[in-house]
Amino acid sequence: MKFFMVFAVTFCLALSFVSQSLALPADDEAHFVDGLEALKTIEPELHGRYKRATCDLLSGTGVKHSACAAHCLLRGNRGGYCNGRAICVCRN
């Protein structure tokens, strides 16, 4: 059993080294973007804005208002609070 395990591990290592040495580099032309027209064809990534992350996610830990206030201070406001709909409202 021990011989079989040593043989199996050695075989897997040898197989991975051989497959790495046989790998071909990617074509440079495949990912090359040339010019303004090519940039227009690339679709922008869509990112969702979750306004309730500070108040909703941290409400179970009991730090929801202080996390919202810290978030607002980092944005340059005077502080903030979580309203009834669990949205962080920053003071000006």
Swiss-Prot record:
Induction trigger: Induced in the hemolymph by septic injury caused by dorsolateral puncturing with a needle contaminated with lipopolysaccharide (LPS) solution. Induced in the salivary glands by feeding. Induced in the fat body and the grease coupler of the salivary glands in response to oral ingestion of S.aureus and P.aeruginosa.
Q: Which GO terms describe its biological process?
A: defense response to fungus; defense response to Gram-positive bacterium; humoral immune response; innate immune response; killing of cells of another organism
Q: Which residues form the propeptide?
A: 24-52
PTM info: The disulfide bonds are essential for antimicrobial activity.
Q: In which tissues is it expressed?
A: Larval fat body, hemolymph and salivary glands (at protein level). Expressed in the salivary glands of all larval stages.
GO MF terms listed in the record are:
lipid binding
**Which cystines does this chain contain?**
C55-C82, C68-C88, C72-C90
UniProt keywords, alphabetically: Antibiotic, Antimicrobial, Defensin, Disulfide bond, Fungicide, Host cell membrane, Host membrane, Immunity, Innate immunity, Lipid-binding, Membrane, Secreted, Signal
> Subcellular localization, per the record?
Secreted; Host cell membrane
> Function of this protein?
Shows strong antibacterial activity against numerous Gram-positive bacteria. It selectively inhibits peptidoglycan biosynthesis through complex formation with the cell wall precursor lipid II (1:1 molar ratio) thus inhibiting cell wall synthesis. Shows antibacterial activity against the Gram-positive bacteria M.luteus, E.fecalis (MIC=32 mg/L), S.aureus (MIC=16 mg/L), S.carnosus (MIC=2 mg/L), S.pneumoniae (MIC=2 mg/L) and S.pyogenes (MIC=2 mg/L) and against a number of methicillin-resistant S.aureus and glycopeptide-intermediate S.aureus isolates.
Question: What protein family is recorded?
Answer: Belongs to the invertebrate defensin family. Type 1 subfamily.
Q: What is this protein called?
A: Defensin Lucifensin
Give the species: Lucilia sericata
